[in-house]
Amino acid sequence: INATVFNQDIGNWQTGNVTNMGGMFTRASAFNQDISNWQTGNVTNMASMFLEASAFNQNIGGWNTGNVKYMQSMFQKATAFNNGETPGESNHTMDWDTKNVGSMANMFSWASSFNQNIGNWNTGTVTSMVSMFRNAIAFNNGEAPGESNHTMNWDTKNVTSMASMFQDAKVFNQNIGSWDTSKVSTMIYLFSGATNFNNGDAPGESHHTMNWSSGSLESMAYMFYRAEAFNQPFGSNWNTASVTNMSYVFRDAKRFNQNISNWQTGNVTDMSYMFGYATAFNQPIGGWDTSKVTNIK
């Protein structure tokens, strides 16, 4: 840890018996050696493995990750990492087996060069995706900015938090409208600053419904704050009955103008700046129950 000058060839190490690689190259800011041939089949922990390893950019897409349970912060602030490619390019597939991973929180946060197609990862056991792509400013699941053909077919049925998942992921715009979000309790800042996100549609268009279920949702504060392209309708499973905080939800969402008159707001206490500078919004919400709201400025 903090081996800031280390950059020696260790590609031939025998790692077949290693079970824990957590934090291995944390803040190893000079390290960028080929370790693609490492045997990782017994590793269960890769959390923070390349945290702030700001020079590392090798192709490790062939690693065996079938037993890994922890990947949180694995590439957090690994600003050069794009699986061996130049920033934003997407020809080095990461076909990792992630079926046992429980946490991907902060996995690519501030990984500002990363843009590989990981849409087929098995995420069925993941419970936390907090800040997973926060400030991953090049990430669009292997596509160029503005494109939206690489669907992320993720199984999200066990995820409980998506807070800040795509916050400031400025070019991301894939269709994720069919994700199962029934267990997610917090979506705060989820798409905040994701200025190109419109669920795979062109900016301001409204053909890709967000068919998310939200029966467990309690807070959606700042969810679409500064999501300037977003303008999709919400499907029939969108349930806000348990939500208490809707502050800043659509602030600066300049294109949003969908009918949300059926939202259940009976438990909401904070609606501050909910539509601040949402300059296109003009829908009938006069029937909302605001009896518990204490902050509505």
Language model regions located:
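Negatively charged
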Residues: 1-297
